[in-house]
Amino acid sequence: MADFLTAKSNATDCQALLDALYADDLLGEPSGPSALTGFEQGDSRLFEQVAGYDRAGLDARMKWLRTLPDTCDEFTATGSGGAERTVQVTEASVPDVGDARTGLRVTVRGDADGAPATLTLDLATVRVDTSAVTVMGGGLDGGRTDSVEQAVRQGTERLKTVLDGGTPSPLPGDLD
């Protein structure tokens, strides 16, 4: 999966997207507390980050993410050894939670181990005041839309509980 995200593009915004996906920092560097967790199964993974940000920087980064389906609709990235990969970026729906939200689906087509392969990632970011939940899920066997949406809903509710001074339930399914 990493080989697909370390490819290089001549388009600045598109390269910035690939770099952010590889580094797991779609919203940039947090300016406050942050927590990061991830799960892998086979060629798929689910990643979630909750963090505090500078409000202006957070809003700017979310605005930038919303431009990517137009700016980086479809582009070519070159992997190590000169292998070309076709990258497509489309808008994705995000549950109506939080103060602001944006979603993307990124599809990278190329060869892996000498055979055609497609990496699909579903991405969602939700802002709550100056904090945000970022969820990314997918892999070589497809996106994880349902898992990403569920993680966004639960993560946003848990973040709101913490920001309101409460302690979230120890089990994500037991929302207060």
Task: Give residue spans per PLM region.
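A small/polar (G/S/T-enriched), proline-flanked helix-loop surface module common
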Residues: 1-111, 115
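Sec-exported extracytoplasmic/periplasmic mature domains
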Residues: 55-56, 67-70, 153-164
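Residue-level signal for alpha-helical context at structural boundaries
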Residues: 76-83, 143, 166, 173
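A short, solvent-exposed beta-edge/loop patch
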Residues: 87-158
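Short, low-complexity, Pro/Ser/Thr/Gly-rich segments in the mature regions of secreted, periplasmic
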Residues: 159-176
